[in-house]
């Protein structure tokens, strides 16, 4: 990390006055948990996000199916919901990077595990650490100040998009396809995705 990034990251760290968020982002992920191939075909792993911005008059939503090729690169575990949910904030930052540069962002997540990993900046699991690193590298590149908090699942508007249920344009919503950086470091096996 170069000196410029360090200086910027501490800028305003001692400001005690509350600051209004420029952008509020909700993220979520879904992963079929019964382990059956048929279920994954009907309800594939997905991520969803919702952005509310002072600069954008309409709420913005996005979703994306998480490809099996990406999931296969993660450490094996019975259920990959944590990794899927961790991918959602990365996709939100990347997709909406033009709105987020040098902004104060409130990120609301309904997964306690993902919230904790992002706040701590690490995890005992190597693949979780890797995605956490991608998230914070991206936040640093965008010079975004992020406050992360938990939102109850029932109060998370990104729950619908993470299951393929989008709000309609006639309800005032704008829909954009979520995407993630083409190059995400992958130290396990030195692969790039």
Q: What name fits each language-model region?
A:
Residues 1-17, 23:
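Amphipathic alpha-helical
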Residues 16, 39-40, 76-81, 120-128:
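Conserved, non-catalytic sequence blocks in retroelement Pol enzymes and Pol-derived host proteins
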Residues 21-41:
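Two-metal-ion RNase H-like nuclease active-site motif
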Residues 21-24, 46-48, 57, 103-106, ...:
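Beta-sheet entry/capping signal
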Residues 25-28, 78-79, 83-96, 107-109, ...:
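C-terminal, well-structured subdomains that either form a transmembrane helix-short loop-helix hairpin
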Residues 51-87, 113, 122:
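A short, polar/acidic, helix/strand-boundary loop motif
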Residues 94-163:
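RNase H catalytic domain
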Residues 141-193:
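C-terminal functional segments of enzyme domains
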